[in-house]
Every structure is written in structure tokens, then in C-alpha cells.
From Swiss-Prot:
Molecular function GO terms recorded: translation initiation factor activity
Taxonomic source organism: Xenopus laevis
PCI domain sequence ranges: 180-339
Name listed for the protein in its UniProt record: Eukaryotic translation initiation factor 3 subunit M
A single BP term in Gene Ontology: cytoplasmic translational initiation
Claim: Plastid is one of the keywords in the record: no
A GO CC term assigned to this protein in UniProt: eukaryotic 48S preinitiation complex
């Protein structure tokens, strides 16, 4: 990748120009190059670059891109410390101090490096941190498949893998990207093992609460399979999740009556919980029954007779349930409902359906052969 340079001169002259520029901005730095070589010059230049990050003139962008371009031409073994130092400077700049420039500089550095260099991890983490402070997460790559590939390419340790995923999750949350954040959190929790699951206790707790809060999250059984979530078994938060996964509204109401303070401490809205549990309960009813009377719905979902039809219309809008209202007979005719859990029983049902299709297709094929032979 070609990175913009400060001036088209030799690396040594470029370093000298940068020194002079920084000194003119008030930095405590010598105008003379170091005898130790370019990497020593860059270390001193990066240490003094704070002064120009506060300015708003065009020379700032040129000078900082020049620093980036010089870092990129160094041998890999000399880059790492400089990259860490530069990233630290760009991240620590106060909020509001040219975040778009800092993002651009980090992006130039990130994309200018060889794709397999582990030091890209440091730059990517810095990108996430800066993007989070200015709501600029949309300007950096966050696709989970790509992040997985980078984690593999950089051969990250388990700890560093957790760091980058946690940073990405928090940045997505801060930038109101709840759907993407939820996927990243599941990826993070899924990377823990039985040996270290206890370390993710707080992350698992956050994941459950955010899933319960999300008005569009209805299928939560996959969370129970995550090892850090399993580690919470026996705690109220795990009991609450289990209710949202497979229990009825009545179970939630009983839980709330016994643990109101706990629900409030999580920042959950009881009214929103009731609304979600009504839909989840209705989904379960629709799986087991092709026809459901208004009276049954009213009783199971604890609502007034005048609320039933509006509820059904809202339920259909979620696309979790497909049904029609029979106003004459005061009932609902179900055509399809999404299973709240997908376990062994559901796999067996799917197998039976596919096997039936296979047998029917074979019958059709044999019939066509018989006709053609005749």
C-alpha cells in the first residue's frame, strides 16, 4: 500500500524535516538526527509528536503520514516498539482532538503493514479504541469473519484474542450497533474452555442481560451452551435466562414476584420482559397447537379480551409466528411457529420430514419411469 509522505527526500532528510517541524511547534527535540539510525530518530519523533496532534493545519496530516510511511519501511523487528508507541500516542489524545485524523493515520498504518504481522493486532486495537470515542466504528473493518481470519493470521494468544473481541464488543455497544455487538459477544464467550470459563463471568452476565433487553432477540437457547454461561448455573441470572429460553409467562411472573429487586438491579424493564415473554409463550403454544382459542390466549398470556387481537397482529409482525385470526370462532389458526429451542427432538422431527420428502420423491420418480416405459 502507498502511504502519503511528508516530502520526497531520503529517509534521513525526511526525519530531519520532521524534527524541525516538531521543534517549530514547540516540541523538546533536537533538529539533528541521531547517530543510532532511523529507528532511533522515529522513536524520538513519535515521543514528541503530541504537539502537532493538537493543531488543525494541513501540515499536521502530512507530517504524521510521513511518520507512518517511515515506520513501514523499517525491518519488522524494529517496527514493533515504534508501532506500540505511535498507537499509544494516537489513542491517548484527548477526546475531540482530531479523531478523524487519528483514525486515518491508524488505518494507513494498519493497511500498510504485511497482513500476517502480529503487530497489526496492536494497531487494530488502537483503531477500535479511537473509533469508540468518536462514534466512528462504521469507518473501520468489523466483519466478524474477517476478524476471525486476522486472529488466526496473527497467531494471537488466547488472552489477546479475548482482548480484541472484548474491545470490539464494547465499541459496537457504544456506537449503538447492538446486533453486531451480540454476535461478537457470543464469539467471545464461545472461545472460552472449561479451564478458563470462570474468567468470563462478567462477560457472560453482560451477554445475558443485553440479550434479554434486546426487543428483537427471541431465540436464546444457544447462550445456554456457552461454557461461561454454564458456569453461572445456580445463580439467579442463569435461572432468568432459562425462563426466557423455554418457560412460560407464568414462570416469569413468579420469578419477578420473588426477585423484583434483582430484575431492577439488572436495568431490565418488567413491562418489556412481560411483552417478550408473552410472545415467547405464544410461540410455544403455536408449536403444539394448530388452533388456539382467544380464551386460552387470554388466560395463558394474562391479558384482557380486548388486547388479544392486537397482540396477535404484533406477534405476526415479528415473523416468529404465522397465523390467521378467525374472528367468527374467536380463535387463531396457526400455519407455522418458530421453535424456541432446537434440540434432539427438533432434529428428529426435521429428519422425519426430510425422509418423508425423500420417499415421496422416489415414488414420483418411479411413477415417471413407469410412464416412460409404457
Amino acid at each position: 500500500m502507498s502511504v502519503p509522505a511528508f516530502i520526497d527526500v531520503t529517509e534521513e532528510d525526511q526525519a530531519a524535516e520532521l524534527r524541525a517541524y516538531l521543534k517549530s511547534k514547540g516540541a523538546e527535540i533536537s533538529e539533528e538526527n541521531s547517530e543510532g539510525g532511523l529507528h532511533i530518530d522515529l522513536a524520538q519523533i513519535i515521543e514528541a509528536c503530541d504537539v502537532c496532534l493538537k493543531d488543525d493545519d494541513k501540515d499536521v496530516e502530512s507530517s504524521m503520514n510521513s511518520v507512518v510511511s517511515l515506520v513501514l519501511i523499517l525491518e519488522t523487528d524494529k517496527q514493533e516498539a515504534l508501532i506500540e508507541s505511535l498507537c499509544e500516542k494516537l489513542v491517548k489524545s484527548r477526546e475531540g482532538e482530531r479523531p478523524s485524523l487519528r483514525l486515518q493515520l491508524l488505518s494507513n498504518l494498519f493497511h500498510g503493514m504485511d497482513k500476517s504481522i502480529p503487530a497489526r493486532y496492536t494497531v487494530y486495537c488502537a483503531l477500535i479504541k479511537v473509533a469508540a470515542t468518536c462514534g466512528g466504528i462504521v469507518y473501520i473493518p468489523t466483519d466478524l469473519d474477517q476478524v476471525r481470519k486476522w486472529i488466526s493470521d496473527w497467531n494471537l494468544s488466547t488472552e489477546k484474542k479475548h482482548v480484541v473481541l472484548r474491545l470490539l464488543y464494547e465499541a459496537l455497544v457504544d456506537c449503538k450497533k447492538s446486533d453486531e455487538a451480540a454476535k461478537v459477544m457470543v464469539e467471545l464467550l464461545g472461545s472460552y474452555t472449561d479451564d478458563n470459563a470462570s474468567q468470563a463471568r462478567l462477560d457472560a452476565h453482560k451477554c445475558i442481560v443485553r440479550a434479554l433487553k434486546d426487543p428483537k432477540a427471541f431465540l436464546l437457547d444457544h447462550l445456554l451452551a456457552l461454557k461461561p454461561v454454564k458456569f453461572l448455573e445456580g445463580e439467579l441470572i442463569h435461572d432468568l435466562l432459562t425462563i426466557f429460553v423455554s418457560a412460560k409467562l407464568s414462570s416469569y411472573v413468579k420469578f419477578y414476584q420473588n426477585n423484583k429487586d434483582f430484575i431492577d438491579s439488572l436495568g431490565l424493564s418488567h413491562e418489556q420482559n412481560m411483552e417478550k415473554m408473552r410472545l415467547l409463550t405464544f410461540m410455544g403454544m403455536a408449536v403444539d397447537n394448530k388452533e388456539i382459542s382467544f380464551d386460552t390466549i387470554q388466560q395463558e398470556l394474562q391479558m384482557g379480551a380486548d388486547e388479544v387481537e392486537a397482540f396477535i397482529i404484533d406477534a405476526v409482525k415479528t415473523k416468529m409466528v404465522y397465523c390467521k385470526i378467525d374472528q367468527t370462532q374467536k380463535k387463531v389458526v396457526v400455519s407455522h411457529s418458530t421453535h424456541r429451542t432446537f434440540g434432539k427432538q427438533q432434529w428428529q422431527q426435521l429428519y422425519d420430514i426430510l425422509n418423508t420428502w425423500k420417499l415421496n420423491l422416489n415414488k414420483v420418480k418411479n411413477s415417471l419411469y413407469s410412464i416412460s416405459d409404457a
